[in-house]
Amino acid sequence: MVPLYTDPVRVARMNNEIPQYRESKRANIACKKAIENLLAERFDGMRLHGDCAKELCDEFGADRVGWVLACTVQHFSWDGRFRHHNKLWADEFLIPTDPDDRTTDYCVNYHPEIVNGLIDQYREYVQTLEEENEHDIGLC
């Protein structure tokens, strides 16, 4: 799995990390496309079927899926259809805002209410993972 690169492109240039930046950005775009494809396949007009968040996290990693979803919400922050609690969650991510970073390349282009459903599913899945890890640590 490709590591998530979260610094802006100007930092990548300064640190000679452009290859890592580009590889991560390609993975972000692939994740965005996978999200859009999964939503198209699994949303029946009323609900999102299956364990979409888990499948995406298994393929791309929870960090990347969260990054792409948060970037989407931040980019469309003006859209009142994104739920307030998801906007607050997305604001916790330090997504680069410089136009050179072109973060819009990996913003999910889907109806906000359906994306809200996936974000809720993702957040619940990540919380479950965190609780399992806490439980495992307590057993040591």
Predicted region positions:
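A detector of low-complexity, intrinsically disordered, Ser/Thr/Gly/Pro/Ala-rich segments
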Residues: 4, 12, 33, 70, ...
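Short, aromatic- and cysteine-enriched interfacial helices/patches
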Residues: 5-6, 82, 140
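Acidic, low-complexity, intrinsically disordered interaction modules
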Residues: 46-124
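Charged, low-complexity eukaryotic segments
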Residues: 1-22, 106-122
